[in-house]
Amino acid sequence: MTKYTFKPKDFKAFNVEGLDARMEALNEYIRPQLRELGEYFSDFFTSQTGETFYPHVAKHARRSVNPPKDTWVAFATNKRGYKMLPHFQIGMFEDQLFVMFGIMHEAKDKATRAKVFERKFKAIQQLPDDYRVCLDHMKPDKPFIKDLTDDDLIEAIQRAINVKKGEFFIARAITPQDKRLKSDKAFIAFLEETFDQFLPFYSA
């Protein structure tokens, strides 16, 4: 019995038709692990940064018709919410598990906070080849950093700084069949390795 990881069939919760039925599927197949990951990595980030982190499992409370296409647990230093702060995420779409750190368009002082990515531009480029960027958290698209030109990357960061709807996340994503989801030990190791790469951007 696994505690933290997800099986390929768990991702099929996103195929369930209808809001209520899909929410039931998320509650059964995905949320228990997100809650456990929330506890584990809140302690991890608190230990790594010296700041108290809180987990925020997506509630999808505003939805009244359309079922969610993704779900997640986010980590931030505010107990009441995470969207206003730079934050870490573990989440899922139907075809991927993703891990991210960055800034949403709703963040306070977004222009100032997003400049960390400008200052750490070289560090972004030096991330391992399977690291990506996400420029819209509502979409599954996450191009590999290695496939972007310098100008592409600069433009993406500038958009997060200067455009109201702009966002910027560094990310990693794996498929539901990935071997790193086969056991809790492998999954936690993958997540810790990823967050170790993200943390210098948080503390910068």
From Swiss-Prot:
The organism's place on the tree of life at top rank: Bacteria
InterPro entries: UPF0637 (IPR009403), UPF0637_domain_sf (IPR053707)
Family: Belongs to the UPF0637 family.
Annotated protein name in UniProt: UPF0637 protein SAOUHSC_01054
Species the sequence originates in: Staphylococcus aureus (strain NCTC 8325 / PS 47)
